[in-house]
Amino acid sequence: MGGSFFYNGKKQERGIFMEYRVERDSMGEMKVPADVYWGAQTQRSYENFRIGSEKMPPELIRALGMLKKAAAMANYNLGKLDLRRRDLIIRVCDELEEGRLDGNFPLSVWQTGSGTQTNMNVNEVIANRGNRLAGESMLHPNDHVNMSQSSNDVFPSAMHLAAVMSMEDRLLPALSGLTGTLRRLEEENRGIVKTGRTHLQDATPIGFSQEISGWREMTEKGKSMIEASLPGLRELALGGTAVGTGLNTPR
């Protein structure tokens, strides 16, 4: 799978015997659970960095899948990737975006700042799932799925993409609903006067609608500031590769 040889066996982990396969890469052999699509690099990271229980957000994994799909299409258009491999990567990325491969991303969020482990986790899952669908070893995690990319441009791009989608799909609609509710409450409570408080003591009178208007204005300004951040978030680092020079990326 993913260009590695493998065979079946059993190993004991935390008192439980598990079926496994053995994958080999440039760093040696790794025993990987037989029923998952990740490979040697993911397994190595999983075993060496068991820090905390927090996993990568599913939104980020889906964003990485979208970027891998876009890269496959771009590499095909540039003559770097053949049609069959392009279509295979696209098919698996669609499965990933639909959440059908969610059980294949076990790594902690506590990892290198470049997100190399998770980038390789996604590469391995796409390659191994694609090879399973093809019935032969067609996709390599680095040579095909990660073609023209680096963790240093893909991971920050995925962060931007995940943030934009989360803002547009959930946060901004929720803020719009909250603003509407506050505006309604502001109108409903006109004429009601209450005691304002400062320093945990009664201070001066204030209209309840005036108080609510402050909450509404704060929410509206926050929403406007979030919307103003979107154009910058839509600028992606893709194409910069490892150190920003674009090395190994076709132009």
In which residue ranges do the predicted regions lie?
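Conserved, well-structured ligand/cofactor-binding cores
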Residues: 17-251
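Short, Lys/Arg-enriched N-terminal segments with co-localized hydrophobic residues
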Residues: 2-17
